Amino acid sequence: MHSELLDRSYHFLNFLPEVADFLVQKHKESGLKVDEKGLYNLVTEADLKAESMILDEIQKNFPLDGILSEERGKIDGKSNYTWVVDPLDGTTNYTHGLPLYGISVGVVETESMTPVIGMVFFPELNTYYHAIKGQGAFREKTPIQVSRTSSLKDSLFVTGFPYDRNLSLDTLMQYYKSILQKSRGIRRTGAATLDLCWLAEGKFEGYYELGLKPWDMAAAGLIVLEAKGKITSMDGNDFSILIPSLLASNGLVHEYLLAEFEGQINRVVY
């Protein structure tokens, strides 16, 4: 199993810079075509082309593996591995000329949907993060770990908002206000994979968000876990890429955050 994971990881760590270069070049062009999947959910021709590049590479080199991707959906495979792909996380940032976007490619065990490989590239930040289950987390070649901050007042948090802003917005604002008043602050980057990778290397102490999809957390979630972080749902259930809410932390402030959401999360519609 380990050699199979190394093979897949090594191959894509060498391939994904090609996709990153494409996105950077496309980002410099004017007249980027944008379609709306929803009021706040955008898709560009760059998303679709980047996804095709990644999926073609998977099917050419690992034809028995399954695929789950944001734009194309599910493609069943015959092996024990399924690739989980978000070709452009942070599309709204991308369309507005901001550099905070990434390419997320994870591999999960097909039956359990447990992440075993995570790779996230940030083309215009000129860096990438990666992990193999049981082997630690890395920013490029440097090992990374979550922060050791244990108090809320010294902690910096990050969050995101679901695409449907009308769903339980009042409750979400209550979370935001309560945590903001007890901590050093809350940030929002607009890219879940960036939030998780920055948490993994100690920039943030905690992250929470509702309405995430498997491709938002398969790769970056593993990177957090391998950086000795902790992940559950916002109501404390075990981590799965299929859960509809996510709470990630350095582990030391996790129970404090769970207490903020206690008795409230089941009131949120998503």
For the regions a language model picked out, list residue spans one by one.
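Generic detector of well-ordered alpha-helical packing
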Residues: 48, 71, 87-90, 94, ...
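DPxDG-like acidic metal-binding loop motif
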Residues: 77-138
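An extended, acidic
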Residues: 145-270
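Solvent-exposed alpha-helices and their adjacent loops that cap or buttress functional pockets
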Residues: 35, 75-77, 110-112, 130, ...
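Residue-level signal for inorganic ion chemistry
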Residues: 23-24, 47, 58, 91, ...
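A short, compositionally biased
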Residues: 29-30, 131-135, 225, 242
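N-terminal subdomain of lithium-sensitive/metallo-dependent phosphomonoesterases centered on the IMPase/IPPase/PAP
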Residues: 1-88, 252, 268-270
